[in-house]
Amino acid sequence: MAELKNDRYLRALLKQPVDRTPVWMMRQAGRYLPEYKATRAEAGDFMSLCKNQDLACEVTLQPLRRYDLDAAILFSDILTIPDAMGLGLYFETGEGPRFQRPTDTIDAIKKLSIPDPEDELGYVMRAVSTIRRELKGEVPLIGFSGSPWTLATYMVEGGSSKTFEKIKKMAYEEPATLHMLLDKLADSVILYLNAQVANGAQSLMIFDSWGGALSHHAYREFSLRYMQKIVDGLTRHADGRQVPVTLFTKGGGLWLESMAETGCDALGLDWTVDIGDARRRVGHKVALQGNMDPSVLYASPERIHQEVDQILSSYGEGTGHVFNLGHGIHQHVDPEHAGAFINSVHELSAKYHK
């Protein structure tokens, strides 16, 4: 493997000194880029794009050709694990992901097998190794998975949901059934993420997109408990380096202290949290990633610059901050505005690292 030329992102996650705040964007390979749209059209559909290692590599690298980013993230989907379990993932136009066979009964859950990451998910591993090779050591590669709770919401609901009625009914009516599903998913995620590291991922991120839908107590029981199991089971060293792990619960601002206790290296923050306050609460234990509202990218470059300045100022001096959005970049954002965001982080952050 090529020697890593820019390790700013990995160093910040491990709270080691950096010359400026590293920056990348969730969904940086995505529909806001015309070159992404062209490659997706070539693939035919979204999952065909994910399953073609060369095209998945191409879209992963596209934002790095445009912008001076400090990390690349594997182009894939959080629903690869349930798809590999045989649920029949498909995408409805305007509806998002759906499953032909929802997992909403104990019998369906008992029948689920844990996918072999090198077999049923081999296409993801081939993409990871291809991307790592083609990066040529320019920046680190982030691997990722959805959290067990978030994956379970899609599996039990049969797709996206605004109310989470079916899975919450299961949580309160048949908690043992839901725990069986979450346990299988946690085991699957551990294998999946460790295989990504074995194939070249240099950092890992767990996306708990729907953890914020849970109550205070239920979050600990149905989401955090299983992310803890995953953190305990992950490969944390490879290629002579630490492999940092970031947990991101959207809507999880209430639970930062509990998340920091898991032994992860960093927490992702959504835009509802003040990053300075988060640093005071948990900055002695973990690095922080975030957390500009993606909608700010609709504003003028001058306004974007101001928002970046405000977040950097709130975090303050020293390492332990990876600048990012508070969630994925929106598809209708002007790519020039994304560039203004990245350039603002470069321009404004150096003074915080003297």
Curated annotation (Swiss-Prot):
EC numbers, comma separated: 4.1.1.37
Binding site for substrate: R27, Q28, A29, G30, R31, D77, Y154, S209, H327
Catalytic activity of the protein: uroporphyrinogen III + 4 H(+) = coproporphyrinogen III + 4 CO2
One Pfam family it belongs to: URO-D
Main location: cytoplasm
A GO BP entry: protoporphyrinogen IX biosynthetic process from glutamate
Keywords, sorted A to Z: Cytoplasm, Decarboxylase, Lyase, Porphyrin biosynthesis
Listed pathway(s): Porphyrin-containing compound metabolism; protoporphyrin-IX biosynthesis; coproporphyrinogen-III from 5-aminolevulinate: step 4/4
Record PANTHER family: METHYLTETRAHYDROFOLATE:HOMOCYSTEINE METHYLTRANSFERASE RELATED, UROPORPHYRINOGEN DECARBOXYLASE
Reported function: Catalyzes the decarboxylation of four acetate groups of uroporphyrinogen-III to yield coproporphyrinogen-III.
Protein's name according to its UniProt entry: Uroporphyrinogen decarboxylase
Species of origin: Shewanella woodyi (strain ATCC 51908 / MS32)
Lineage, highest ranks first: Bacteria, Pseudomonadati, Pseudomonadota, Gammaproteobacteria, Alteromonadales
